[in-house]
Each structure stands twice: as structure tokens, then as C-alpha cells.
């Protein structure tokens, strides 16, 4: 009789099954051990299945609250997992997760992947997740005493890898494939992501802030890494000038596409006109939604004056609900050495570190303190593109240095009435 009858039910049906995959890994690890390979946790995946079966029966998790574990010199990158069934299932007494810093754009050679798998087969359960929600390679399940040798072996590979971020620190920056794959990329996402990762190693590996901080780089407004929904600091490619239009290519599309219904009427601001002969765009009304460019990529392309918009505050639910990032900087040049972006980042971190409450994300701090104070921190003027909705009250607040002297107020001061 099966040891895991409840989990076996999850193997049925035409859809992918995580149970099938864990069982495959369990068989491969046990086979490797039987062949005499140096495998430290041959029964790790099998033990995980046993614990999960018990959790389904008991209707509760059997993972303890966690614990602080890491490698020498690092404060993050490892998520502690301890089982309260350690005596019953010793294979999962320790089952820590390691986050491994992925390459920009998630480009791998098979050689790099084989190196990763060889290290993890030796020191861990063999279970991986490509990739976690932040973008890291996830190694699922190892013991405390195997963390350091696993980390050292990763660093000694011909194509070496480092640990990513976890805890209240800078999480591993991630980027779309950008100019390596996409014709719409408005800046080099791969280079910027790598540069930020290497510049902020201390912030990445040593938790020091109120809570996590995520950076994602999207090459164009299509935002294939969902940066506006999943990062505190989204760097989304955009352009300042007009969309480039090839009228001959537009006519080719018109021969088989209903431009009026598929493009013109779906423009969110009504910025496009098509008279059957010529396509015109009122670029002052364009909000860079990319719909027209996506529908007619041979005819329409982003403008030549390219850079990025910075959005702030995106996150999943925790203290407050899920939030989509909003505009903090409408346009920024994205050129090496990226000083403007780094100056904004460092100003934000200093302010957040000083003013933020425990487990308060940067967006929640801005909600609490106000966008006006945030703009002072980053040295920017208010812009209509930062406004989510029109104001709903008549009150306006000014700093003293913003007020201009007047004869009326001077007279009130003389009379002691000010």
C-alpha cells in the first residue's frame, strides 16, 4: 500500500503534478546513492512527501516558525526550515531553502545548469524551482551543516554562482530579456540589472532595513517582468519623442487587418486616427500603453529619445493590500554608470531606513508620510503624471519657505495678530 494515498490523488488528471515531480527526484536521488555517488540527502525528497501527507491528514503545516541560518559573512540568502516531525522523519528535520542569484534575463548555458544541478545533487534534496517570485533560482531542502560547503562549491564552479537576497534587504534585482531578444527594449535591462546587483552587494547580502526592497528592470511598457506589480522600484523603458510610423507598412497591415476596430478604437486615450490612407497619432495624448505597437510592430516603433520611467511602491499584500506602483520619476536617462538612478535609490533607502516602521514597505511609508515629503527626499518637482486621481478636498499645505511675503501679513504681524 502507498505511503502517501492523499498525495497520490494529485497525480491524477491531465495537468502537471508537483507530486509526480517530487517522486521523480526522490527516485533519481535514491538511484544516485545506490550507484555510490556522493549524495548527502538521498531521502530528502521522499521525506518531504511523507511530511506533506501527514500535513494533509492533520490539516496543518509541520514546518516550525523558521530560524536564522546562513553562510559565513552573509545575513541573507537562506530561508530556515525546521520540521516538528524531525524524530519521526529525520530526512526533513532541517530542510532549508537557498536562493541563488540568477543571471540577468535568466539566460543559461546547459553547462551552467549542469554545474548547479551537480552541486545541489551532492549537498541538497535535488529539488529546485526555476524560479522564485523575485527571480532567484530556488534550491529546496538542505541541512544546516551543508549550507557552507554548498555555497563554496557554487562559487568554485567554472561558471560560478552567488547567493541572492532574503529578509529585510535588497532582494535580487531581475530584468526582462531586453535588447537580447526584444525589438521594443528602450534601454539595456541586462546591463543595468547586473550593474545594480554588483554595486549593491552589501545591501543584497546583509539585511539592514525595515523590510524587503525589490528592483525590477523592464525594457518597455509591456513590462514582461510585471515590475509595476511586483517591485518597490520599477524601472520601465519608455521614450520622450513621437512614435515612429512607417505609412507603407501601415497600408500592408490594412490589407488584412481592421485597423479601425483593432487599433484605433482600442487606444485608451483616443490618440490615433486612421482615414484609410494615413495613420496619425497625437503623441501628446499617448500614454505609452504599447497596444498599437504590439498590433503593428512592423509599422510602429518606440521613438528615438529613449530612457525609463521609475515607478515606486508596487507590492503584494502584507501590511496593506496589493499595490500597483505609481510614477515617481516620469523620465530618467539610462546610461552608464547609471548615477541618476543610483542617487535616487540611495536617497530613498536613507529616508526609509530612518522613517520606516518594522515591516513597512517603501510604498506604505509614502502613504503614511505623503508624496510631497517623498519628492523632497529624491529632489523632484511634483508632476501631473504622478497623480493617481484628482484631489477630493479643498485644503492645500505649504512650507514656510514657499510662502511669499505680503503687505497684509506684515500689517498683521505689527499688530500681533499673526
Swiss-Prot record:
Thermal activity profile: Highly thermostable. Inactive towards methylviologen below 55 degrees Celsius.
Localisation per UniProt entry: Membrane
Main location class: membrane
Cellular component, GO annotation: membrane; sulfite reductase complex (NADPH)
Amino-acid positions noted as binding [4Fe-4S] cluster 2 in the UniProt annotation, renumbered to this chain: 267, 286, 289, 292
Binding-site residues, [4Fe-4S] cluster 1: 176, 182, 220, 224
Keywords from the named record: 4Fe-4S, Heme, Iron, Iron-sulfur, Membrane, Metal-binding, Oxidoreductase
Group of enzyme by EC: oxidoreductase
Reaction catalysed by this enzyme: [DsrC protein]-trisulfide + NAD(+) + 3 H2O = [DsrC protein]-dithiol + sulfite + NADH + 3 H(+)
EC number: 1.8.1.22
UniProt record, GO biological process: sulfate assimilation
Cofactor: [4Fe-4S] cluster; siroheme
GO molecular function per UniProt: 4 iron, 4 sulfur cluster binding; dissimilatory sulfite reductase (NADH) activity; heme binding; metal ion binding; sulfite reductase (ferredoxin) activity; sulfite reductase activity
Cofactor binding description: Binds 2 [4Fe-4S] clusters per subunit.
Function description: Catalyzes the reduction of sulfite to sulfide. This is the terminal oxidation reaction in sulfate respiration.
Name recorded for this polypeptide: Sulfite reductase, dissimilatory-type subunit alpha
Species for this entry: Archaeoglobus fulgidus (strain ATCC 49558 / DSM 4304 / JCM 9628 / NBRC 100126 / VC-16)
Amino acid at each position: 500500500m502507498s505511503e502517501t494515498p492523499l498525495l497520490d490523488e494529485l497525480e491524477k488528471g491531465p495537468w502537471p503534478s508537483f507530486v509526480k515531480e517530487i517522486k521523480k527526484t526522490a527516485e533519481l536521488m535514491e538511484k544516485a546513492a545506490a550507484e555510490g555517488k556522493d549524495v548527502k540527502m538521498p531521502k530528502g525528497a521522499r521525506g518531504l512527501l511523507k511530511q506533506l501527507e501527514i500535513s494533509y491528514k492533520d490539516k496543518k503545516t509541520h514546518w516550525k516558525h523558521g530560524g536564522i541560518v546562513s553562510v559565513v559573512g552573509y545575513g541573507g540568502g537562506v530561508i530556515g526550515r525546521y520540521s516538528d516531525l524531525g524524530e519521526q522523519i529525520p530526512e526533513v528535520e532541517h530542510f532549508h531553502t537557498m536562493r541563488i542569484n540568477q543571471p540577468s534575463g535568466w539566460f543559461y548555458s546547459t553547462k551552467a545548469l549542469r554545474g548547479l544541478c551537480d552541486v545541489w545533487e551532492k549537498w541538497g534534496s535535488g529539488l529546485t524551482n526555476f524560479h522564485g517570485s523575485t527571480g532567484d533560482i530556488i534550491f529546496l531542502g538542505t541541512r544546516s551543516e551543508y549550507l557552507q560547503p554548498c555555497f563554496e562549491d557554487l562559487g568554485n564552479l567554472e561558471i560560478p554562482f552567488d547567493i541572492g537576497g532574503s529578509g529585510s534587504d535588497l532582494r535580487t534585482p531581475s530584468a526582462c530579456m531586453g535588447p537580447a531578444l526584444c525589438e521594443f527594449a528602450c534601454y539595456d535591462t541586462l546591463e543595468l540589472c547586473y550593474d545594480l546587483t554588483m554595486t549593491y552587494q552589501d545591501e543584497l547580502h546583509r539585511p539592514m532595513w525595515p523590510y524587503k526592497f525589490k528592483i525590477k528592470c523592464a525594457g518597455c511598457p509591456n513590462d514582461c517582468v510585471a515590475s509595476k506589480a511586483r517591485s518597490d522600484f520599477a524601472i520601465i523603458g519608455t521614450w520622450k519623442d513621437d512614435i515612429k510610423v512607417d505609412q507603407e507598412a501601415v497600408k500592408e497591415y490594412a490589407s488584412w487587418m481592421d485597423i479601425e476596430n483593432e487599433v484605433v478604437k482600442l487606444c485608451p486615450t483616443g490618440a490615433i486616427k486612421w482615414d484609410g490612407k494615413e495613420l496619425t497619432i497625437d503623441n501628446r495624448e499617448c500614454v505609452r500603453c504599447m497596444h498599437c505597437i504590439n498590433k503593428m510592430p512592423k509599422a510602429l516603433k518606440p521613438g528615438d529619445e529613449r530612457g525609463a520611467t521609475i515607478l515606486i511602491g508596487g507590492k503584494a499584500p502584507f501590511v496593506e493590500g496589493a499595490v500597483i506602483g505609481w510614477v515617481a520619476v516620469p523620465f530618467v536617462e539610462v546610461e552608464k554608470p547609471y548615477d541618476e538612478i543610483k542617487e535616487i535609490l540611495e536617497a530613498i533607502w536613507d529616508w526609509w531606513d530612518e522613517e520606516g516602521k518594522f515591516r513597512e514597505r517603501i510604498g506604505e511609508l509614502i502613504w503614511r508620510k505623503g508624496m510631497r515629503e517623498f519628492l523632497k527626499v529624491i529632489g523632484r518637482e511634483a508632476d501631473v503624471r504622478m497623480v493617481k486621481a484628482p484631489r477630493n478636498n479643498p485644503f492645500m499645505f505649504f512650507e514656510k519657505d514657499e510662502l511669499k511675503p505680503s503687505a497684509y501679513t506684515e500689517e498683521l504681524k505689527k499688530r500681533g495678530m499673526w
